[in-house]
Amino acid sequence: MIGLALALASGPKAEAHPHVWVDTVVTAIFSQGKVTSLREEWWFDEDFTVTALSDIRKTKGMSRVAIRPLTEGEIGQLRAQAFSNLANYAYFTHVWAAGKPIAVAREVTAFQARMDGARLAYSFTLPLAAPQDPRAGPLRIGVWDDSYYVDVGPAKGLAPQVEGDGSQGCAARIIDDKDHLLYFGAVTPKAMEIKC
């Protein structure tokens, strides 16, 4: 079911509207003054969490899904059954350097899944296809599902960050990305903008 839910994320727009909600925070990782990767943290809504846990624990409903730490086996199942499919959608991650689209890698590093209270959380590092210098022009990073089946947005109270070698003098902020409207122009996604 969880693999199906995320596979449907790029289904026809006519059937879209959020079925899953995800809060995110992104940290841009610098090396030698350029952004080389993005560390992303995702928190799923409680309904999706129950569905995901029910699938891997073979139970039905919240009353039978114990909110407890995930086992290594469960983390492996989540990665195989739900997370790995997101590579087909660039992990819902969109990057532009000076207005030009930048590719991300198909494989992530440092994948983890965990429980954060009653919510399933993912964390992972997503390399950029090529390092980007935000000093050459603003770097914009958005995490959203183009079909709007999954509503992805910045986590409240958690600001985007920059870190690493050469990140000094750079700052990240959340902006309304009016250049990439969703759901027939009705939804303005949020994006992280880095300027140095």
Model regions: which residues?
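Bacterial N-terminal signal peptides
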Residues: 1-9
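Early extracytoplasmic/domain-onset interaction patches
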Residues: 17-50
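Glycine-rich, aromatic-bearing surface loops/beta-hairpins
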Residues: 139-143, 147-196
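Short, solvent-exposed beta-strand/turn "edge" segments of beta-rich domains on protein surfaces
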Residues: 28-37, 111-117, 183
